[in-house]
């Protein structure tokens, strides 16, 4: 069964409502200043504290140093960290040494070229790969990419792969059928306005995922 991550939550109320609606994981953008959905570590800690025990919490970061991630993990205590910048494998190794219990998800930007080679570098270091559409702002723009490329990457790496980039209730079934990911990630595709999830769209998105074979 394809898992669902609802990303860009900004309040405990939204996060809990998404979890109750059936999300497997809740994502929060911590100190990612370029995003309108950016929240502080304190806010993320509060969101994490209200989630049910079997719903994963994922903080999304674009850190300058491994130490920033280590500090955030110790404060927020998330299930996983999604590294959304250009962090090399050694960056992840350093984090694992300091906080070995946290899962690490590395974003690969599709459209830059050499994606398979980049993804393979993180085998044995990352716990999963997330495929987002490349953009001048480093992804997170709500734009789709070629899902056939994603499927090729998924078939070439020995890691669970999460598909992101412009997904919505209208296209997620097609995306799953094309790429066959471990999980799908949605942010703006389930919003009526920025920073606020539309629970009708959240439920519709999750329903589309669950019924897709």
Curated annotation (Swiss-Prot):
Signal peptide: none annotated. Keywords: Amino-acid biosynthesis, Aromatic amino acid biosynthesis, Isomerase, Tryptophan biosynthesis. The keyword Cytoplasm does not apply. GO terms for molecular function: phosphoribosylanthranilate isomerase activity. It is an enzyme of class 5 (isomerase). Pfam families: PRAI. It catalyses: N-(5-phospho-beta-D-ribosyl)anthranilate = 1-(2-carboxyphenylamino)-1-deoxy-D-ribulose 5-phosphate. Its EC number is 5.3.1.24. PANTHER family: N-(5'-PHOSPHORIBOSYL)ANTHRANILATE ISOMERASE. Belongs to the TrpF family. This is N-(5'-phosphoribosyl)anthranilate isomerase.
């Amino acid at each position: 069964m394809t898992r669902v991550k609802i990303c860009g939550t900004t309040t405990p109320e939204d996060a809990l409502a998404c979890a109750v609606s059936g999300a497997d994981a809740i994502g929060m953008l911590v100190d990612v200043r370029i995003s309108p959905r950016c929240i502080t570590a304190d806010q993320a800690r509060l969101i994490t504290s209200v989630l049910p025990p079997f719903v994963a919490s994922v903080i999304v970061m674009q850190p300058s140093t491994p130490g920033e991630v280590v500090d955030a993990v110790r404060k927020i205590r998330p299930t996983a960290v999604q590294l959304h910048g250009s962090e090399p494998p050694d960056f992840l190794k350093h984090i694992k040494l300091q906080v070995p219990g946290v899962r690490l998800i590395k974003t690969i930007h599709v459209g830059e070229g050499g994606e398979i080679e980049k993804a393979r570098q993180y085998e044995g270091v990352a716990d999963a790969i997330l495929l987002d559409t490349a953009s001048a702002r480093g992804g997170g723009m709500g734009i789709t990419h070629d899902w056939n490329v994603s499927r090729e990457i998924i078939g070439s790496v020995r890691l669970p792969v999460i598909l992101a980039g412009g997904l919505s209730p209208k296209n997620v079934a097609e995306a799953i059928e094309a790429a066959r990911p471990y999980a799908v990630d949605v942010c703006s595709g389930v919003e009526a306005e920025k920073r606020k999830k539309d629970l009708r769209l959240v439920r519709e998105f999750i329903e589309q995922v669950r019924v897709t074979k």
